[in-house]
Amino acid sequence: MTQQALIVVDVQPTFCEGGELGVDGGNAVAERIATFVKQHRADYDYIATTQDWHIEPGDHWSEQPDFVDTWPVHGKAGTPNAELHPAIAALNIAHHFKKGQYSAAYSGFEGIEDNSDRIQSREQVAAELEAGHTLATALADANVLRVDVVGIAESHCVKETALDAQRLGYDVRVFTDLTVPVSAELGQAARTEMQANDIELVHS
């Protein structure tokens, strides 16, 4: 049987309705993902979450954001809205990857495994990356062959995480009913790009 991993990308209150960068449908997607994990947990050899965990991300944050390269303050490390969505937190998933501490980071593969809520220094984050405490290392150690990606937002961090998994040689699926884009237009563009890179878009 193929070794499979499930990556739950950035399902945080900051990206759900009422959050700083709330996406319409975010809370509903969080609940659907939680139901899926409860029903299919045994199908996966490795499950992880990712989180935006911004400490001082430079010009990724802006008071006058363009919503392309710069954004309002969001995913601020140590705040309730940067925590996992309650529906996901209740699953007690073992592996958590924090990303974007000191720079923009859209892919879960840019993060480090951190199963606490530490506010690390720039040097500590760099040391963790250098030591290989990354999603790529974790998937390799688990002998994973296929990666399923779900979460928020399909048009941004889900897409970039899926593309990085594909570049690393994994068979990749994105469950389209377990993700939501920032907008319909950006979602369609993301799906076109993912399909062009041999990522399978399927219903869960």
Question: Locations of the language-model features?
Answer:
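Active-site flanking residues adjacent to catalytic metal/cofactor-binding acidic residues
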Residues: 9, 51, 176
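Short, glycine/acidic-enriched loop or turn micro-motifs at the edges of active sites
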Residues: 13, 55, 154, 180
